[in-house]
């Protein structure tokens, strides 16, 4: 087993080699490693390994996720400049040159180990960097297999395979050391992991907690909205932090919406069964704090219902009606499972109130969605919601992280801004893995008169 310092030395030697690569050579590297975690046989193997090892999600969804995430990053970087001169503006005299950030420490989640690993590697290497991945201990085998596949891709094009490594020492001391000696950290995982990254002393990108919530307005295509929400919630048994946790249909379409949800395989849990479900989903953890039961995370509705002692048949998603006060009902929380809370709102104004309260309690800064064609609703949310991304008439688990039907940058790392304790609101993607040098040349100077600057101000307030 290599030490962190030994792995870092290998990474720096590999990065030094590609530091002088051309754009064409770097793009070949990205295609080589991308293919290894996109090719059908390989990703079927990785998906099966990930489900067997972690117990999270399902194989078919993880195969699709590989295609979406890796394919999405490859689409985003195709033709993009990341070596040398990337931009020149003759009018301003500004030229921009891309430089590597160096060696990146990338911390991976157990819920989405191999697709996140593949997409991240492509984006990081696009900037002529090296990466050392720290997998979840629960997903070590599947993540290592994905990394070995990509190392084979590097060998195929004659590139140094140590551009991509997995941290060999699983100890807490090793990951702490790796974070300190890396040039940049990208942390996709729990709040504890992200806080450790931010406190390491190394520049870091992290994610905030999810609790994606969507409004269904009175003008929505209700059948289509229900279909999208169910598809999003069921996908990989809701491993994605962008999977809808709550939906807020307005009263005018509530009954129709619930009927459509039933058509899409949902079952409304009520009465004593609702209480049983709550008590099964949230239990005291090792510290005695009520927390999400690990046994329900990314499991099927049937497995969750069986554990709760609820009788259901042919059900894909469990629904519960939300109660107010919202804080007093645990179902407002992030669930990471095919369990969805439904809140009935009087109208859009009331739906907005519920949305704000939900996301202020959990998932501040992450995301929200709306199913509507009314631009005034969309613009109102854009103006007022403290969300880093607002997804309109789309599946949130697909749309938030980039998809062919929108132009969001493809990623599995969603920044939540200062609202969520992060350094950016952006989808963390390949452009976050380059340093940019700004070269400025002299141009005609700008000037202004006092009247130009303060004229209107003086008219209103005087000198």
Role assignments for model-derived ranges:
Residues 1-95, 123, 263:
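N-terminal Rossmann-like NAD(P)+-binding subdomain of aldehyde/semialdehyde dehydrogenases
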Residues 82-224:
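Rossmann-like NAD(P) dinucleotide-binding subdomain of oxidoreductase/dehydrogenase enzymes
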Residues 118, 194-326:
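ALDH superfamily catalytic-core signature
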Residues 15, 19, 310-463:
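Conserved C-terminal structural/oligomerization subdomain of aldehyde/semialdehyde dehydrogenase
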Residues 132-137, 248, 393-394:
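Short internal beta-strands
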Residues 20-25, 45-47, 160-163, 237-241, ...:
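Flexible, glycine/charged-enriched surface loops at secondary-structure junctions
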Residues 7-9, 206-208, 237-241, 329-336, ...:
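Short, flexible turn/loop "capping" segments at secondary-structure junctions
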Residues 12-22, 30-41, 50, 54-58, ...:
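Structural signal for hydrophobic packing residues in well-ordered secondary-structure cores
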């Amino acid at each position: 087993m290599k030490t962190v310092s030994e792995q870092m030395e290998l990474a720096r030697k590999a990065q030094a080699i590609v530091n002088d690569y051309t754009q064409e050579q770097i793009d070949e590297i990205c295609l080589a490693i991308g293919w290894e975690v996109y090719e059908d046989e390989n990703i079927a193997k990785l998906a099966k390994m990930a489900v067997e090892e972690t117990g999270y999600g399902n194989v078919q969804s993880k195969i699709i996720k590989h295609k979406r995430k890796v394919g999405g990053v490859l689409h985003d970087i195709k033709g993009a400049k990341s070596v040398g001169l990337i931009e020149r503006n003759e009018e301003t005299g500004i030229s921009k040159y891309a430089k590597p950030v160096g060696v990146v420490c990338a911390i991976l989640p157990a819920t989405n180990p191999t697709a996140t690993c593949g997409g991240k590697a492509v984006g990081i290497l696009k900037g002529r960097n090296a990466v050392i991945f720290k997998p979840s201990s629960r997903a070590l085998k599947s993540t290592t297999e994905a990394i070995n596949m990509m190392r084979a891709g590097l060998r195929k094009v004659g590139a140094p395979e140590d551009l991509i490594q997995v941290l060999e020492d699983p100890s807490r001391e090793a990951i702490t050391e790796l974070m300190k000696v890396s040039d940049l950290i990208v942390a996709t995982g729990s709040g504890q992991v992200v806080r450790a990254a931010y406190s390491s002393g190394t520049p870091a990108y992290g994610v905030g907690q999810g609790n994606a919530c969507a409004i269904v307005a009175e003008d929505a295509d209700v059948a289509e909205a229900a279909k999208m929400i169910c598809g999003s919630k069921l996908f990989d048994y809701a491993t994605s932090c962008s999977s809808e946790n709550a939906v807020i249909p307005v009263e005018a379409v509530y009954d129709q919406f619930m009927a459509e949800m039933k058509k899409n395989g949902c079952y409304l849990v009520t009465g004593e069964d609702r209480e049983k479900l709550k008590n099964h989903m949230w239990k005291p953890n090792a510290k005695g704090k009520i927390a999400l039961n690990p046994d329900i995370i990314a499991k099927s509705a049937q497995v969750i219902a069986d554990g709760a002692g609820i009788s259901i048949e042919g059900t894909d998603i469990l629904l519960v009606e939300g109660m107010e006060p919202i804080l007093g009902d645990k179902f407002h929380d992030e669930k990471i499972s095919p369990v969805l809370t439904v809140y009935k709102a009087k109208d859009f104004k009331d739906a907005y109130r519920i949305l704000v309260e939900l996301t202020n309690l959990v998932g501040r800064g992450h995301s929200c969605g709306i199913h509507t064609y009314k631009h005034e609703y969309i613009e109102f949310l854009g103006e007022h919601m403290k969300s880093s991304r607002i997804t309109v008439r789309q599946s949130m688990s697909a749309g938030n992280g980039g998809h062919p039907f929108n132009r969001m940058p493809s990623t599995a790392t969603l920044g939540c801004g200062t609202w969520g304790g992060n350094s950016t609101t952006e989808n963390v993607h390949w452009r976050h893995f380059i340093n940019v040098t700004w070269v400025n040349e002299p141009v005609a100077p700008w000037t202004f008169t006092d009247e130009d600057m303060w004229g209107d101000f003086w008219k209103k307030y005087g000198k």
